[in-house]
Amino acid sequence: MAARRALIVLAHSEKTSFNYAMKEAAVEALKKRGWEVLESDLYAMNFNPIISRNDITGELKDSKNFQYPSESSLAYKEGRLSPDIVAEHKKLEAADLVIFQFPLQWFGVPAILKGWFERVLVAGFAYTYAAMYDNGPFQNKKTLLSITTGGSGSMYSLQGVHGDMNVILWPIQSGILRFCGFQVLEPQLVYSIGHTPPDARMQILEGWKKRLETVWEETPLYFAPSSLFDLNFQAGFLMKKEVQEEQKKNKFGLSVGHHLGKSIPADNQIKARK
């Protein structure tokens, strides 16, 4: 049986950072378990995060009214995307597991990683309206976010000043990763790293390596299955009426995004259902 492959996408500029240490720990742990590890160190690569006409070679379909989604999708089908995008596609295609390592910035991913998502996850390659969520192209791949924060865990709690971390994670984990079909594993959250002493940092790194020993066996986070929705333009991609009726008797919504006007299930974007 061929070794599994992991892709680690790092979005931090400094090799002295804890994010870099987390990346190195992941490489070490996975290789020790027989994984082949690919890397995309976005700052070291000087990765261009800006979508533009330069992402496409050859003649545009409509140069006067350039529309990136349709032009990049066509370029993907015809093999006319820029070499740096194609290189990332090859890594993604080869990977069984994708780890995104980054510091939380303004309640989201760093700009360079946002640009990676926008340029690399083009229509046709990463999704179509006929192939999204459960049916997405990456449905047999697993992914997880490994995030550091400046603030403490309590700041991202239900009563914390920043609000619920589950809500912050939803646009990334559902709106990007699950949308493309990924099975999304529990995020690796490292809070307040700037105020964490060296011995505690070492414990975090060791715990991360320990987790990665069995990461492939982990249960993914729960997202509302596509089968609950009428997935067509005529129906508006809405939740089926019988499902809505069935859900009325439940105290909690299905997920952070599909809360149905009710309380959100606790830690829906942080802990997998047991």
Curated annotation (Swiss-Prot):
It catalyses: a quinone + NADH + H(+) = a quinol + NAD(+); a quinone + NADPH + H(+) = a quinol + NADP(+); ubiquinone-10 + NADH + H(+) = ubiquinol-10 + NAD(+); menadione + NADH + H(+) = menadiol + NAD(+). Pfam families: Flavodoxin_2. It is an enzyme of class 1 (oxidoreductase). There is a cross-link at residue 251 (Glycyl lysine isopeptide (Lys-Gly) (interchain with G-Cter in SUMO2)). Homodimer. Interacts with PDLIM4 isoform 2; this interaction stabilizes PDLIM4 isoform 2 in response to oxidative stress and protects it from ubiquitin-independent degradation by the core 20S proteasome. Interacts with TP73 (via SAM domain); this interaction is NADH-dependent, stabilizes TP73 in response to oxidative stress and protects it from ubiquitin-independent degradation by the 20S proteasome. Interacts with TP53; this interaction is NADH-dependent, stabilizes TP53 in response to oxidative stress and protects it from ubiquitin-independent degradation by the 20S proteasome. Flavin-containing quinone reductase that catalyzes two-electron reduction of quinones to hydroquinones using either NADH or NADPH as electron donors. In a ping-pong kinetic mechanism, the electrons are sequentially transferred from NAD(P)H to flavin cofactor and then from reduced flavin to the quinone, bypassing the formation of semiquinone and reactive oxygen species. Regulates cellular redox state primarily through quinone detoxification. Reduces components of plasma membrane redox system such as coenzyme Q and vitamin quinones, producing antioxidant hydroquinone forms. This is NAD(P)H dehydrogenase [quinone] 1. The lineage of its organism: Eukaryota, Metazoa, Chordata, Craniata, Vertebrata.
